Amino acid sequence: MEVKSAKELKRISKELQENFLNRWKLLNLEQDKDRLKSLTEKAEDPNLWNNPEEARLVSQKKNELEKKLNPWFTIQQDILDFPDLVDLTLDEKGENGVGELSSEYNRLQEKFEELELLGALKNPEDLKPAFLNIHPGAGGTESQDWAEMLLRMYTRYFEKKGYQYSLIDVQAGDGAGIKNATLHVIGDFAFGFLKGENGVHRLVRISPFDANKRRHTSFVSVHVSPEIDDDIDIKIEEKDIRVDVYRSSGAGGQHVNTTDSAVRITHMPSGIVVACQNERSQIKNRDTAFKMLKARLYELEQEKAKEELEKKSGEKKDIAWGSQIRSYVFHPYNLVKDHRTDHETGNVAAVMDGDIEPFILAYLKTL
C-alpha cells in the first residue's frame, strides 16, 4: 500500500505491532516457545541418548516446534521495533522519511500475512510429510490422461516450493495416462498446504483422443493424508489385511525392476488399498506401504471422531472428500476456478505448470 503521510505511517505501524502481539497470544506461541526451550535443554543432555527411543521423540518434537516458530522468530523483532524506528526516522527526516519507511512497512505486512496463514495450520498433522494419491474416475483414457496431467502439475508445484517428493506407486493407463499414482511429499507444512487438494478435480476440454473433436468432461479424485509418527498407536491386525507382491513397472509400461518387489496391501474391513513399488527392496516397499495404510486408518479414525462430535453438537458440515473442489476449463474458454473459495484465473497453462499456490493460500484463508 502507498503510505501518504507521517501520521498515517505512525498509526499503521502501531496497528501492525498490535496485530502481531494479538496473533502471538491467540496461537499460544509463548507456551510453544517455553516448550521449545525445555526440549532444547533435554536434547543437550548427554544422558538422554541412554534411551534412544526417548531421544528420537525429543528430537522430533523439537524439530517440529522449530519449524512452527522459526518463521515467527525471524520477523518478530522487526515488527515489534518498527513503531520506534518510525518515530526516530520521522524525527530526523520528517515527511521525507515516509517513502523509505513505507516500503519497509509493506515488507513486514506481507510477511505477517504469510504468518497468519501458517497460523491457520495449527494441527500437529499440518507439519507432517504427506501422501498424495491421484485416482482417475470413470472415463477410461480421458480421465487417465487427466490424472497424468495432474501428476505433472503437482510435481512442478513441489519443485517450485522446494519440497522433496518421490513417486512411490504408479500404474500405467490403457494407452495413455495413469490408472493411479501415489507421491510421498516432504517439506515444511507439507500436509497443511496440501490437505486442501482433497476432492474431485474436473477437466473440460476438446478431447485429443476423439476424432470428432468433441468436448469431454473428465474427473480425477485427489486424496492427501499425513504421514503418522511411530508413537501414534494404530492397531493393524494380520487377519484384516492381504499382502500381494508383484513386479514393478512405471507409467507408460517402462520396466523398473525384474523382481517381484512391489507390495500392495488391502485392509479388508475398511476397503483401503495402498501400494508401493519405488524401492528395489520388497521389505522397504512393504514398510512404506504400511506407513501409508497407517496414515489412512488414522485419518479414518479422525473422520469418525469428527462426525460423532458433529452429531452430538447438532452440526453437520459438508464432507469435502468426494466433492468437486476445482474446475479446469480448456474449452470454450480458459479458466481454472476453485468452487470453495471462488478464486480463479484464466492462465490455465501456468496452473498446469504448477502455479497452484494462490489456490492453496485462498483455501487456507477460509480455515
UniProtKB/Swiss-Prot annotation:
Methylated by PrmC. Methylation increases the termination efficiency of RF2. Pfam families: PCRF, RF-1. It is found in: Cytoplasm. It comes from the Bacteria. Keywords: Cytoplasm, Methylation, Protein biosynthesis. The modification N5-methylglutamine is found at Q254. Gene3D superfamilies: 3.30.160.20, 3.30.70.1660, Release factor (1.20.58.410). The keyword Protein biosynthesis applies. GO terms for cellular component: cytoplasm. Its main location: cytoplasm. InterPro entries: PCRF, Pep_chain_release_fac_I, Pep_chain_release_fac_I_sf, PrfB. Disulfide bonds: none annotated. One of its GO terms (molecular function) is translation release factor activity, codon specific. NCBIfam families: prfB. Peptide chain release factor 2 directs the termination of translation in response to the peptide chain termination codons UGA and UAA. Belongs to the prokaryotic/mitochondrial release factor family. HAMAP family: Rel_fac_2. This is Peptide chain release factor 2. The lineage of its organism: Bacteria, Pseudomonadati, Spirochaetota, Spirochaetia, Leptospirales. The gene is prfB.
